[in-house]
Regions:
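C-terminal and inter-domain tail/linker signature
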Residues: 2-153
Length: 153
């Protein structure tokens, strides 16, 4: 008895990636694009053509202000073509960021990003991060109950 097994798909139709492959792609995005040791050109191999330049520019803008950034993934969940990532970044404010001069302060903040994967690349992404906390840590937003000027005691 012989058994022959093969897979036939519709012409032009892509075989969906597995949940693990999608999670691995998101891990690579964090390591290869967002961490200070990564290359900005990694965006071209990680993102769909329509998204690559915007992703590269966002990473460049952030890394200009925080050149030593290290991002770690705390949790990843994948279902179908979607991946959710909870991540944490640590860095030192060493360059201009959103018009704010370098403070030299170390920061730590978290975020959650959602991705849609298509054809082995990130087709869309949405991120919610603690920008308020980040701005407070670099001194752009005063701590509650503290004025900008020192009050005499």
């Amino acid at each position: 008895m012989h058994a022959v097994l093969w897979s036939v798909g519709e012409p032009g139709r892509e075989i969906p990636m597995s949940a693990q492959e999608n999670k691995d792609l998101v891990r690579r995005e964090q390591e290869e694009l967002w961490n200070h040791t990564g290359e900005l050109d990694a965006a071209e191999k990680l993102f769909a053509a329509a998204q690559a330049e915007a992703a590269k520019q966002q990473a460049a803008d952030f890394r200009r202000g925080f050149p030593d950034v290290v991002s770690t993934i705390e949790d990843l969940i994948a279902e179908g073509d979607k991946v959710a990532a909870h991540w944490r970044s640590r860095a030192t404010h060493q360059g201009d960021y959103m018009g704010i001069a370098p403070s030299g302060k170390e920061v730590e903040f978290t975020g959650i990003s959602f991705y849609r994967i298509e054809g082995g690349k990130i087709a869309e992404s949405w991120t919610v991060e603690d920008q308020f906390g980040l701005m407070r840590q670099i001194g752009a937003i005063p701590e509650p109950g503290r004025s900008e000027e020192a009050s005499p005691t």
